[in-house]
């Protein structure tokens, strides 16, 4: 019989996750303040950098920072039981992935049978099980999303399992989650789908257009 030894999170707010985040100047910023505690929680940020805004009910911070630099701010999370605070640093420059990425990858669960519905169900589980409140944020689509052939202009497209990856990315971002995708440097992926060989820059532009993080 499965059992859980991890103690339940307290009713009072507790801010979790990394204390630093990297982003490039002018790039889209997305970060959900990870916090546990009895719902509803209310989120506030002191010294929020210009160009960013925080949703006080979801804790999702979005926007763009134009200028390079180190930005220190204070996260504040409140509920009817208490308050928690934490100093948080954003490094705006060329340094990304300043902490180990935390998230989910489709391969071990779904292999080549991953599709849009299964991805979204897994994302909902990330939220409903509280992983997002502990700093888990990436939803990564592994192999099996690619169409059988490119468009006439060489652009890579998704197959029928993912009708619109741009909309999928937008859906994930609205939940405060980040969008990851699999690619291969060879002509084909391990699963026999399209690789990025001789289309590396073109595919990278497509991923950016879809909102891949």
PLM segments and residue spans:
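Proline/serine/threonine-rich low-complexity linkers at boundaries of modular beta-sandwich domains
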Residues: 1-13
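Solvent-exposed, low-complexity, repeat-rich "mucin-like" stalks and linkers
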Residues: 12-40
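A short beta-strand micro-motif common to beta-rich folds, especially ectodomain repeats
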Residues: 33, 69-81
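Strand-loop-strand motifs at the edges of beta-sheets in extracellular beta-sandwich domains
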Residues: 50-67
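Extracellular and select intracellular beta-sandwich modules with Ser/Thr-enriched
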Residues: 82-88
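An acidic-aromatic substrate-binding cleft motif
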Residues: 91-118
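Aromatic-lined carbohydrate-binding/catalytic grooves of carbohydrate-active enzymes
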Residues: 108-110, 122-213
